Design a protein with these regions (language model features):
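Histidine-centered active-site microenvironments of extracellular/periplasmic hydrolases
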Residues: 24-28, 204-205, 211-251, 286-288, ...
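Active-site-proximal alpha/beta segments of enzymes that process anionic O-linked groups
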Residues: 1-9, 14-169, 266-267, 272-298
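A short beta-strand-to-alpha-helix junction
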Residues: 71-78, 174-186, 226-234, 247-274, ...
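Polar, surface-exposed loop/tail segments
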Residues: 254-259, 278-315
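Metal-dependent active-site segment of extracytoplasmic phospho-/sulfohydrolases and closely related
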Residues: 8-9, 187-226, 271-275
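Active-site-proximal cap/lid insertion segments
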Residues: 100-105, 155-202, 227-237, 244-246, ...
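Short beta-strand segments
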Residues: 93-95, 150-157, 182-185, 207-212, ...
Length: 322
């Protein structure tokens, strides 16, 4: 197994597949991602879901061994950053979200183990919030890395207030809230294109993975409130890019990922696929049945869950709120 190189994990915010052109939405909200379908480095996934509809519970599971399907104690679960550190990766956490606040603590704990940290939106929840657009993150991406690096980039993405997320309006229709959300999705697509351009130029680039923490329901103004759960809050994008040399070194991994493009997957399992992609072996606890790049992957629509194990994905089709 090829190990090492530079890998990038981009975490989106509040982006639902329902408003993404690349997933069939009628507006041109994701022109870059749509074009990427022609890029041989790109592997798109159709059926990704959030494990929860709020950032901290969602990312606490996503970035650690803990998931909806195991009975692991969260306090004992390793995080992807801790494991990457031990495996000899230089770790970076670059964020446009605040570091400390009532809601950010477990995610901040994970981020705090990264060797290099850049927080572009201040430290504390009660400090003056800066409405920095996500392009502020671009200059923070290292221009050269050690031989092995894991760069995690946490976007503000499509978080409400949507109008604060992008510089210039693009869409105008009958619903100003939806227009603003679609503008945020379109700007997010631009940001992803710029991140990809930068990291792809790194001499040792191997792969980039993008997923959103959870979705959003702007149409009903429900945002991502778990107590008013609707399926757009759970439907998220997942896409991966792997360099030609990674694909040449790891053809089986690529073949297995491609065979799972239509598979059902929840983002509490990003940890498992990242461990595989990073080439990390010999951990005390591994779950190949939850690894999207494994032949043993066994999550299906029938056994997949969201809202931390309280809602079954199998119920999506019968839900009144599509």
């Amino acid at each position: 197994v090829s190990r090492g190189g530079t890998f990038v994990l981009v975490i989106g915010e509040s982006e639902t597949r329902n408003h993404m052109q690349v997933y069939g939405y009628e507006r041109e909200t994701t022109p870059w991602m749509k074009d990427q379908r022609e890029n041989k480095e790109n592997i798109p996934f159709s059926n990704a879901y959030a494990n929860y509809t709020h950032t901290v519970p969602a990312l606490t599971y996503a970035l650690s061994e803990k998931n909806q399907y195991n009975d692991m104690d969260l306090q004992e679960a390793y995080s992807i950053v801790e494991v990457a550190n031990v495996a000899g990766y230089e770790t970076y956490w670059i964020s446009n979200q605040r570091k400390f606040g009532v809601y950010a603590t477990p995610v901040s704990e994970t981020a705090s183990t990264a060797q290099h940290q850049e927080w572009m939106n201040g430290m504390f929840a009660d400090s003056e919030e800066k409405e920095n657009h996500d392009d502020i993150l671009l200059p923070q991406i290292p221009q050269s890395c050690e031989k092995n690096a894991l760069i995690i980039i946490h976007l503000m993405g499509c978080h409400a207030d949507y109008r604060d997320r992008y510089p210039d309006p693009y869409f105008s229709g009958e619903d100003a809230t939806v227009d603003a959300y679609d503008d945020a999705v379109r700007y997010n697509d631009y940001i992803l294109s710029q991140i990809y351009e930068r990291v792809h130029a790194l001499p040792n680039f191997k792969g980039m993975i993008y997923f959103s923490d959870h979705g959003e329901d702007p149409d009903r103004r429900l945002y991502h409130e778990a107590t008013k759960f609707t399926w757009p809050m759970a439907r998220i994008p997942l896409a991966m890019w792997f360099s030609e040399d990674f694909q040449a070194d790891r053809p089986e991994t690529i073949a297995r990922l491609k065979s799972h493009e239509q598979a059902y997957w929840t983002n509490d399992l990003i940890y498992d696929v990242m461990i595989d992609v990073l080439g990390i072996e010999g951990l005390p606890h591994m779950e190949p049945q939850h690894d999207l790049a494994s032949t043993e992957y066994e999550i299906t629509k029938e056994n997949a869950m969201t809202l931390h194990g309280t809602v079954r994905l199998a119920d999506e089709d019968s839900a009144a709120a599509k």
